[in-house]
Amino acid sequence: LAVLRRIERERRTSCKKKSVTNKYIIKMPMKLTNGVSFPVTGKNSARSTTSTGKRIMAAALRGVGADKEADAILNEKNWRFGYRKHMENVAVAMSKSNKDCVKLARAGLEEARKIFTYRIKDGKEESLERVVGRVGESGSSSSSKPSREIHTGIVYGEKRFKGQGKLPDVEYEGKTYSGPELVSLAKTFAAQDQALDSFAMSVEEAVKHPEWFDLRGKVFVLIGATSEMGPLDILLQCGATVVALARKNSRSKPDKWKNLLRRVVDTPGKLVIPITRAQTKDDDIETLGNIAGADATSELLEIVNWLNSNSIQKLVAKDSSLHIYCGIYLDGEGFVRASVAMDCIVDGCTNASKNSPPTLLYIDTPSHVHFVSPKIRATSEEYRKKAPAGLKILKSLGFAKAPKYISTYDSSDWEIHDGLSIQQGPNYAVAKFLQR
């Protein structure tokens, strides 16, 4: 224990010294890619994720008059490890009112549009805001014209839809739960304070209404359809029409699209995909897999035009709308670019929608700043008191993290849980902020 304490003490001391901290951070030059790009921020055409992320978060705070906190972000010298307290300040500013939440979010997204650029193959760059603003217009400059037309491919499931629908089964600890058993399991979690009462109530309502899971005629756009945690399979099983967006096959994943297309076969769903040419009756799954794919970050304009085309819009019922899921995950700076691109795609579809505005969906993350009820905090602290002795020792050494809570603006019925993971870094935090 003495040795472990000394190691942890030295680690903490070294992290406080900027010179030592930076010694272990290898700054790789950013690889220039076509499409959504970080702006030039320094000498020799340098593009900094740090200054860009700081500008977005500072602009968000200025949107609600939090100038002092915004200045603190811009003056932060150690953004890689110091971004955490600033994310907490953003959450506090959002806690003032629902109106401030919207104003702060809008200000952050608008700043991202203003400073990010859109780069085409010949190296020309233009403000992303200008490019997105001209989506669908004729006579736009060459830098904002789509480089290709995306065609529509459709693969139908071979299984017939039975009955009204049904809440999908849930596997837990080697057992499959459905119906009353699933409700009982959810209530057990709630009784043990492992989930909120509203969670158990929602599961019970879903079991009572199997018709909710008849998604025939509903159109879901999955941006990042191949993501591990995406809802592709469950939507297809419920008979939905899924418009799948993902990058083309690569050397590391040569069968990505073929494997994705096979997932629709044993379902009552329908899979709509972007392809490079018109589909023919002779195209099988392998053929379609080789010509499928579109990149959200580098083919943003092409994707927006495709989603707004007649071939996609005719799938949407007059009394319905698109449901757009933003699910791309990339490492590092790519995640920020992807989040900005997904927001632009959503905006392009919203502005062109003739029906109701699209419904937006995304997967949240536990490793960010969240609003929680006092009951959640009390339960968390109670469980921590009952933790095994070994876990308490690790916590005292700094190897196990205890939840951190901060007060909201007016200390109301909500508290703020800081679940940020420093290992993930500020790019991840900024990207998830943009999605939220």
Provide a role label for each language-model segment.
Residues 196-216:
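A short, basic/flexible loop-to-alpha-helix module at the beginning of a structural domain
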Residues 69-195:
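Low-complexity, highly charged intrinsically disordered N-terminal segments
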Residues 217-236:
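Glycine-rich adenosine-cofactor-binding loop
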Residues 254-312:
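Extended charged low-complexity segments that act as oligomerization/scaffolding linkers
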Residues 24-90:
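Non-catalytic protein-protein interaction scaffold segments in large eukaryotic complex-forming proteins
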Residues 359-436:
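Long, contiguous domain-sized segments
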Residues 288-369:
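Extended alpha-helical scaffolding regions
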